[in-house]
Amino acid sequence: GWRDWLKKAGGWLKKKGPGILKAALGAATQ
C-alpha cells in the first residue's frame, strides 16, 4: 500500500536527502 511506499520513501530520503538538496541548490544557482 501507499503507507509502505511512504516508509520506503522516508528512509530513502533520510539517506539521500542531503545530497539531493545540495544537487538541487547547485542546479538552481547555475
UniProtKB/Swiss-Prot annotation:
UniProt xrefs under Pfam families: Ponericin
GO CC annotation: extracellular region
Location(s) in or outside the cell: Secreted
Source organism, top-level taxon: Eukaryota
Keywords linked to the UniProt accession: Antimicrobial, Secreted
Tissue expression per record: Expressed by the venom gland.
Function: May have antimicrobial properties, like most ant linear peptides.
Family the entry assigns: Belongs to the ponericin-G family.
Protein's recorded name: U1-poneritoxin-Ni3c
